[in-house]
């Protein structure tokens, strides 16, 4: 039996299939990132000008305090998605820097201390990723599986950012 015609047909098919899977996955990652960006902006809309400027000492409205606490959860979710491979390298670089900066600004920093106390008492999330990110701006959540870890370190995944 001559395998050449079959090989000629299967190799391009396998390559085309691989490219299609990669493109679909990349599109799905972008869709997930877009959803989280929209959630971020909807929370930002609930902040007063004083909060956006990082001023402390003003009385937070209940809606504003809730939005800040939801921001913490959103940020933890983003880090979780990163560990599952659903956030790209470039996007995580942007998000992690912004999250770290925001967590050090008032009134976020003050509410973060309260949130940690609640977490220690079992009344809130554990926030394992945010705790690390707060102290290490370059923190990148470890991949949740062996294959994801290998893929994240793969040589063809070159950074397009700085």
Model-derived regions: residue spans:
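An amphipathic alpha-helical interaction surface
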Residues: 63-68, 72-162
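Membrane-proximal alpha-helical anchors
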Residues: 1-65
